Swiss-Prot record:
Gene: clpP
Root EC class: hydrolase
This protein's record includes keyword Zinc: no
Family to which this protein belongs: Belongs to the peptidase S14 family.
Protein name: ATP-dependent Clp protease proteolytic subunit
EC number: 3.4.21.92
């Protein structure tokens, strides 16, 4: 099955119409939710998506530096460098970033979920979380392959240390558990320390 063209997907984005003193104003649903400080991180983590997320985080900080931002995540993961651009911005800005997993947060998606403000990281009941070591592949001369292998091992160690800090798990446990794809239910993600609570309703 082929992915729908972007123009078709854009046409399917719902519009919200609001009455203002100057008349009616329409927003696409994501822009309207951005006014409520809600950001969606959905799909593959890559450079273009990361730039959009970073821009929204910086914009909301400039609007109200003391109000929380809500980052909803449904992602299979993706690029480490793109993910780290989002992560570093989350840590850099003044507002707390509350993370919510809906659907799945895998690989870099899980890392960003864990990187939310402590006490404000959540999973919806039927969401899934998956952690593992970074993936890499490179072709070329043996010396270049060795350089890239060393870089990937360095990234792996750095991510493991950061995940240990965010979850409270010992580093050796993180190293063991990320050695292969490690899937968790929402409840298990709470127990592991990737998130702080399970959200079943707004109440």
């Amino acid at each position: 099955m082929h992915n729908a063209p972007e123009s078709v997907l854009n046409a399917l984005v719902p519009m919200v119409v609001e009455q203002t003193a100057k008349g009616e104003r329409s927003y696409d649903i994501y822009s309207r939710l951005l006014k409520e400080r809600v950001i969606f991180l959905v799909g593959q983590v890559e450079e273009h998506m990361a730039n959009l997320i970073v821009a929204q985080l910086l914009f909301l900080e400039s609007e109200s530096p003391d109000k929380d931002i809500y980052l909803y995540i449904n992602s299979p993961g993706g690029s480490v460098t793109a993910g780290m651009a989002i992560y570093d911005t989350m840590q850099f800005i003044k507002p707390n970033v509350s993370t919510v997993c809906m659907g799945q947060a895998a690989s870099m998606g899980a890392f960003l979920l864990a990187g939310g403000a402590k006490g404000k990281r959540h999973c919806l009941p039927n969401s899934r979380v998956m952690i593992h070591q970074p993936l890499g592949g490179f072709q070329g001369q043996a010396s270049d392959i060795a350089i890239h292998a060393k870089e990937i091992l360095g990234i792996k160690n750095k991510l493991n240390q950061m995940l240990a800090e965010h979850t409270g798990q010992p580093l050796d446990i993180i190293e063991r558990d990320t050695d292969r794809d490690n899937f968790m239910s929402a409840t298990q993600a709470v127990e592991y320390g990737i998130v702080d609570s399970l959200l079943t309703s707004r109440g």
